[in-house]
């Protein structure tokens, strides 16, 4: 019996983006780390991401060693010498674990509320919701043809086979038509199937993107949507942008037609079994009612996505509960999460800092993931699902995602305005809903349902009045010459953004993107829009 150590992460979903995980050292990692510390071996476990990776040398400790005599069966006969391993150092964080968990759950609840409202208002359609459950692998379409598939799954699969054959026939029609459609003439459905075909050829390195002459006139027509896939692929063959060695064709003697036939055959053969092509087919089955909302809801129970409930299952089956009300209830109760749907919005982040010490007390990235399933030997199936997940849970939305900061930027604009004497704390600016001084006539968030009327600085911050800060951005742009100048306004905004450190990384000990400050449209930049692109950190 041999003892071994494993990493066990508590409350993994809340902390995974911060802590990261460990794993077996790769050849490249070994070469890099062994060059620094020759005690590394090819059997070591190391930090792969997050704090585990950043503090690898601190957490590592030292390997133990035994010199032994063994018999011909490899059994130890005598221990010649032994060195005990030494544990690495402990790492203490400023994070408040309870606050981290609460923040994660509140953030998820807030995002779920927005998704729920968007569905109720019609901004997200129920067909989008039903397909999202398939597209993001919540409903596993690969189980539909299993021997023990349910009657519902079998019915859906039978319908799918019919529609898949029709989709492949649509492709073949275009590939061999004497008058094929250009991309701009196609339906959205057919264009999706064509897009799949071209992406497949790229991903399999059959279409050699590095060889494509982007200035080529035929390629330009393709880019503009004014060429059929048949004409484009024929041109790719002629220009030798196709690696024919990867096709089932005699590369020495094949002519253009034979190569084209092999290319089309490759596409349609792959489409028969490709999961991404299947999802394109399901995408159009849902709005065409070839797979129903009721079927999807029943499958959520049958595949164990939701805890089985006999009463609810029966009511769904007999129509007492409608699929839409069922799904809305599950979203409202977060039994189906925003991350599972991966509809907009499905991600978020929040950082809470102690203003007295500067310590970070919570740093949440939503959605999280179970880093236990990546440590101590990767769960390959789970890792594949993470990589396919449309909500991208391995991306740290707190430190890596860059977005327009929006109204939080207004405090910086206020500081710039006060410091450059275009504002005073008592100056009042009229909010009448629309800012008329620039061509795009931006509006206040309260317009057209109302206006803020006269606002001073304190009330403008309280109400987050866009007009007040549009005016401040405009006044910064006229400060030097009395004439509006974009560059002058942007220079002032960049100056104060730099003073606040927004153009630099925060220095956190995990992967972090570098924010960029707006370079145009100071009126919009003043409310955190324009091309401001800033991380939460």
Cite the ranges covered by each PLM segment:
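Non-catalytic accessory/assembly modules
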Residues: 1-51
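Amphipathic alpha-helical blocks
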Residues: 57-65
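Conserved beta-strand/loop elements of the cytosolic catalytic core of P-type E1-E2 ATPases, chiefly
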Residues: 89-99
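Beta-lactam-recognizing serine transpeptidase/beta-lactamase-like catalytic domain environment
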Residues: 65-83, 95, 112, 120-407, ...
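Conserved serine DD-peptidase/penicillin-binding transpeptidase domain
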Residues: 42-43, 51-57, 536-537
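Zn2+-dependent metallopeptidase catalytic core
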Residues: 107
